[in-house]
Amino acid sequence: YYLYFPAKDRDGIFRMGVAVSASPTGPFTAQPDYIPGSYSIDPAVFVDDDGSAYMFFGGIWGGQLENWQSGAYDPDGEPPSGADPALGPRIAQLTDDMLGFTDAPREISIVDQDGEPIPAADERKRFFEGCWVHKYGGKYYLSYSTGTTHYIVYAVSDDIWGPYVYQGRILNPVRGWTTHHSIVEFSDKWYLFYHDAALSGRDYQRSVKYTEITYDDEGRIQTIDPYGD
């Protein structure tokens, strides 16, 4: 079992660590160093049908993704703005031992229905952090938090490397800032796990929630109202 986590190195730069255990309940033993070539936050690992494994990751602002636009860390890096294409999450294939990358991470392109990149100014659709990938109907579903607008949205691709075409919202806003999530299949049903601060009545102290998600005949995820009947 492999537990992936972000942590800052001695220079204050986020990297990805990995800890290994013989049991999902632990104890997990961390590797002595971070994964070479890793950066930013919010790792999510997807294992494809052929057994190949991939890490998706990234987050802007506090997640430092904007500092890596040149491929090297720039402490003065600023995220794109206005009509410029928004930053996309990163993808890297994992080595067979699950402890490293086979190559340098690549940026994932998220585009609209016309094939145009989602602009940085479109905070309803642009990537912010907390990505996840699952596979349904032979297609790859990339879901992520929009951050400031508090949506979980998704984009779809025929190729794991992208580009991913924006489709719409999975979850309307919940209380508690961003909505880091995961999507899993269990007993022939699909479920969304996410967090929400409604129980605490604050914008922090979030609780874990889950709800079933459904797809229409064309594979579109039906938008969820978290506080509806």
Model-derived regions, located:
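Carbohydrate-active catalytic/glycan-binding domains of CAZyme proteins
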Residues: 1-229
